[in-house]
């Protein structure tokens, strides 16, 4: 749900907002960050209220990883439509490769008893790093733009696709 399938709207922005694609992307990414942070606060608060046995830091990292994965996917579609396949391929390979290497090292040398944390924590941190990097890259290119018109356009296209994605 955090993704809102906005990557599909980014594809259509290349037709509908040809001259403002960078601003469209930044607006989309900033919405993803704002919505994800809001949902993270709600989910973490509910987990504390319900006194769940799941560690708080694990819930937080999973929520932040979800947000960052959405950012990476949105940016990946942007790169695909720009025909920038070198950077897109790097964006698909490097975070995954880096998180696997760090996960193996973490499982071998840090998390001897809870090895699953050795996979979850490095993956979440690497994904979060790349997500934050891409948001800053987008803001640097187009400025700090949050255009409600772009957001309405994007949500009109992507919202029906949420149920499709769940199915």
Identify what each model region corresponds to.
Residues 12-20, 68-91, 142:
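Membrane-interface junctions at transmembrane-helix termini in multi-pass inner-membrane proteins
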Residues 1-17, 66-72, 130-133, 162-167:
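Small-residue-rich midsections of specific transmembrane alpha-helices
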Residues 82, 86-91, 113-120, 132-167:
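Interhelical loop/hinge segments that connect adjacent transmembrane helices in multipass membrane
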Residues 29, 33, 37, 63-67, ...:
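Residue-level signature of the transmembrane alpha-helical core
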Residues 44, 48-60, 82-90, 94-130:
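Membrane-interface helix-loop junctions in multi-pass transport and translocation proteins
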Residues 1-47, 87:
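Membrane-water interface segments that mark the loop-to-transmembrane alpha-helix transition
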């Amino acid at each position: 749900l955090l993704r809102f399938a906005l990557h599909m709207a980014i594809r259509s922005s290349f037709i509908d907002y040809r001259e403002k694609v960078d601003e469209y992307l930044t607006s989309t990414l900033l919405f993803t960050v704002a919505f994800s942070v809001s949902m993270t606060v709600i989910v973490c608060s509910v987990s504390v209220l319900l006194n769940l046995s799941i560690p708080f830091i694990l819930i937080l990292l999973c929520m932040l990883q979800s947000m960052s994965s959405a950012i990476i996917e949105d940016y990946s579609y942007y790169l695909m439509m720009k025909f920038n396949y070198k950077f897109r391929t790097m964006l698909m390979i490097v975070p995954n490769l880096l998180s696997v290497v760090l996960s193996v090292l973490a499982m071998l040398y840090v998390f001897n008893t809870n090895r699953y944390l050795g996979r979850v924590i490095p993956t979440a941190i690497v994904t979060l790093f790349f997500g934050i990097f891409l948001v800053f890259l987008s803001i640097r290119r187009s400025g700090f733009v949050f255009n409600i018109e772009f957001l309405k356009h994007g949500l009109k296209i992507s919202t029906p696709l949420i149920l499709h994605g769940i199915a």
